[in-house]
Amino acid sequence: MFSKSFQLMTQGKSLKAMEHLSEVSSKISEGEFLQLSNENNVTLKSSEYIKIISLKTAELFGAAMKVPAILTGKKNQEIVNLYKLGINFGIIFQIIDDTLDYFGDKKTGKEIGKDFMEGKVTLPIILLLKKVSKPEYMIIKKLFTKNKRNQKDLNLILSKLKKNEIKRDCLNYAKKYQIKSEIILNKYDNKQSGLFKDLLVSSIQRKN
């Protein structure tokens, strides 16, 4: 994708767009490194999680909004607004994806517990650890320090996530970024913003 984008921008002689994609490529690499270095880290904070997914995932969405705006000669403020919308949408997308890893449906093709089995600490686990008792915290921590986790371990986590209503908490967390996006979209007329607002809602409600 990046090589094709660079080719098109070279033809269009858009140095600004090329510089941004180069920056995005660097940020994605940083995000991947941060995620790998935080595997099994149950002390990961929600702010650190957001930083990781912003770099690893949301920057791609931001670029998808920003680069076309640059190439079509949009004003600077509109480029900034579109970039922010892309970032917010990317964060929502990843939060929901990580939530569905625990609350998805196998019938829709979602493999349940993949992140847990790989030792990835994502938002559902971060929010769960804020709610559980100290003994429960230590049990969950022990599960993440194991070399291998099994279905019994996953079932324990799933029961605690359900008991503590973590799906609701994750959706509410994602909705914060929906609200941020709607504040930007309200600056535009309904025809321009309506479709994107619908997309925000459907992304939070998606099942797989």
Q: Whereabouts are the PLM-identified features?
A:
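Mg2+-dependent prenyl diphosphate-binding active-site environment of isoprenoid biosynthetic enzymes
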Residues: 1-139, 176, 201
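A short structural micro-motif
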Residues: 27-28, 88-89, 146-150, 163-164, ...
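Charge-dense, low-complexity intrinsically disordered segments
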Residues: 47, 51, 76, 164, ...
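Juxtamembrane/membrane-water interface recognition
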Residues: 132, 189-190
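Mobile late-domain/C-terminal helix-loop "cap" segments
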Residues: 139-184
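Short, amphipathic C-terminal "tail helix"
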Residues: 177, 183, 190-208
